[in-house]
Every structure is written in C-alpha cells, then in structure tokens.
Amino acid sequence: MAENILAVENLNIAYQGVPAVMDVNFTLERGKVLTIVGESGSGKTTVIRALMGLLPIGGEVTDGTMLFNGQDLRTLSKSEWRAIRGKDMAMIFQDSGSALDPIVRIGKQFRELFKSHVEITNDECDRRAIELLESVSLPNGADILRRYPHELSGGQRQRVGIAMALALDPALLIGDEPTSALDVTTQSQVVMQMLELAKEHNSAIVMVTHNLGVAAYMSDYIIVMKKGRVVDAGTPQDILENPSNEYTKQLKDAVPTLEGGRYID
C-alpha cells in the first residue's frame, strides 16, 4: 500500500473568527493528483494556502491536522517553513507574474531560489535554470534569464513560475488555478507539461480549479467544495458518472461535451 505524503484531517480555518473552511478531510499519495473544485468563495484556495503556510493576515487554522510526510504543518516555526517551502513543497500561483519580483531579472531569481536551499555556483544555477525552462517549452532559456518579468508574455511568466516551482524537485506541488489566466491552447499545453514533469519528478499534486472538466482530465481524485465544506469526493469516474450532490451535478452540466457525450478536455 502506497504511503500518504499528505493527510488532512478535520481542517477548520477562520478569517477574523468567521469560519471559512469546515471539517475538510483528504489524503494524497506520492505521484498522485488531487484536484479541489468549487466556485469562488468555496474555500478551495484557503485550503491550499493553509497547506503552504500562506494564509493572509486574519486567517487562522482553528482546528485539525495537516500532515506532510508525517509532520504536522501546524507546528512549524517560521524558519522551518522557510526550509521546506520551495524545496519540499512548492506552489504555482494563478498569476506567476505577481509572484515574481518585478525589479529582479529572472536569472537572479532562480539563483536566489537555488542558493536558499543548496550550495551551488552561479554557473550551475544558470545551467539548471535553462534546463528547467526548456522543459516547460521556453527553449531560449539564456535570453529568458536576462529578462525582467515585465518583458515576458503572460504565458512565458506562467511557465517560468512552473519551472521555478519544480526547480528543487518538491515532493508536493500545489497549484492555485495556474492556467486560468492563459488562452485555451496554452492552458492545455501547460496542464500537460505539469503532469509530465510531476510524473518525471514523482511529485504529488494538489490543484485548485473551478473547471470540473480540467479536474476530471488530470486527477486521480477530486474533492468538490461549496461554502467551505466538502460536498462530494471520489475518482473522476465517480464524480462524472455518479455525483452524490446537486452542486456537483451543476458543475458537471457546465462542462462542454462532444457529440456522443465525451467530455472536452
């Protein structure tokens, strides 16, 4: 039986005392993909921010456990968070451009990421960064490293964000709707690259999306959230063929299909 890399039990989160997430439970094995689906305000992004220790001011985990490789994330100090964030777990933001430092060249940002966790020369940083950029379909890596974030397109910045998230071979990759700001063609390419790279690195993925079709395409397991609670959970086949909640049925009905009933990826 595969070992769980992540186990969340009875997770409760509040903002300034107001409950936002209630009694969320799930587990995830290494190399598997779990997707959290729900509308805006459902609590899905709050859950993954809690997993990364990135809840905004006023946000607090009020109850429950979040075990990562057997360690309760709620017990970590600031220095312990710095040690694992980026190295053992990493996050791809909805808009990676906003997560990049606008006044620092991409190459220097890669160097800072590598050197915060491993002893490495500048030349080796650059070599590894170029390899990572090539793996996300940015073949002109040396040129990308010389650029500032504003000199790149939205799709390029998002690919840079994915490359940086994968730079240190994290065991857990977390994505906050990382393709929603991209055009449809680029979305498909980026999702495929994420899955391929995660498989190559044997990383587990927790992904947030509002699109049940995307979730069904990429997931081993799906959680559906509404108003801070899990209202449905199961494999993609379970969710699409036998949804147990009316809200899940509504999400399913919103997914476009081709003639014959096959869902569009």
Write out the residue ranges for each language-model feature.
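Conserved ABC transporter NBD signature motif
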Residues: E60-D72
